[in-house]
């Protein structure tokens, strides 16, 4: 079932990557949009780069984006973590 999943604080290496990894393992969420949000743009970009590599490595179908704009990130979110 496609969802828009927003991960607040995703620039934190432990939280962001572990949460993305857990989502990638869920077949029911495959095809969902994952929005990584953090106020630290540098850390956020690093997390997105690793998340994209994991996505390619594991061959899963998720749309992963990143934003420092909380209001935009939360727009039409179905799940917020």
Feature map (PLM): residue ranges:
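Metallocofactor- and cofactor-centric catalytic cores in central/energy metabolism, strongly enriched
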Residues: 1-81
């Amino acid at each position: 079932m496609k969802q828009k999943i927003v991960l607040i604080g995703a620039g934190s290496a432990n939280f962001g990557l572990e949460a993305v990894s857990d989502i990638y393992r869920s077949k029911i969420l495959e095809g969902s949009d994952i929005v990584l949000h953090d106020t630290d743009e540098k850390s956020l970009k690093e997390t997105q780069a690793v998340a994209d590599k994991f996505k390619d490595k594991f061959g899963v179908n998720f749309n992963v984006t990143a934003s420092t704009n909380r209001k935009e990130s939360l727009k039409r979110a179905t799940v917020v973590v």
